[in-house]
A protein has these predicted regions:
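Basic/polar phosphate-binding segments, predominantly the helix-turn-helix DNA-binding elements
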Residues: 19-52, 74-96
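…primarily DNA-binding HTH/wHTH and HhH modules…
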Residues: 1-3, 47, 87-129
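Terminal helix-turn-helix DNA-binding modules in bacterial transcription factors
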Residues: 6-15, 19-23, 42-77, 104-121
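Recognition helices and adjacent regulatory flanks at domain boundaries
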Residues: 1, 9-14, 26-27, 35
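Residue-level signal for functionally critical sites in structured catalytic/ligand-binding pockets
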Residues: 13, 59, 82, 87, ...
């Protein structure tokens, strides 16, 4: 399942600028949409929609820091209007998208990667017969 979760994160990254249905992610990794969303929320404490929105806004922030136009970035990351993008960006970052380049402020949401770390345990003696 760990590989499937990481495959899903790779799929999201590859399609951040595309219009895609979130159900396509679960199809891509061959897991039911319901179960994938439940597992994702249990591991991250955020919905899949929130994660995709945060990743898109994070990438948009990078573009704005490099001097890209707000209008271009809004449409590039799937927003239907500049007003909608501006509201979402301000709610997410606390500043207007038009202020990013001037203030040189960057808020980031990194790509998730799922790993298992095992610590502790009991040393077991074994004998091969």
């Amino acid at each position: 399942m760990l590989k499937k979760l990481n495959d899903a994160m790779d799929y999201i990254e590859a399609h951040l600028e595309d219009e895609f249905l979130l159900e396509k992610i679960s199809e891509h990794i061959n897991v039911s949409d319901y179960h994938f969303r439940k597992i994702f929320f249990a591991l991250t404490n955020m919905t899949l929609n929130e994660y995709v929105k945060n990743r898109r806004l994070s990438e948009a922030n990078k573009e704005l820091l490099q001097g890209a136009q707000v209008t271009d970035v809004a449409y590039q990351y799937g927003y239907q209007s500049v007003d909608g993008f501006t509201r979402a960006f301000k709610k997410w970052s606390g500043i207007l998208p038009s202020q990013v380049a001037k203030l040189k402020q960057c808020k980031s949401c990194q790509k998730l990667q799922f790993v298992v770390t095992m610590k502790g345990g009991t040393l077991m003696e074994y004998k091969i017969v």
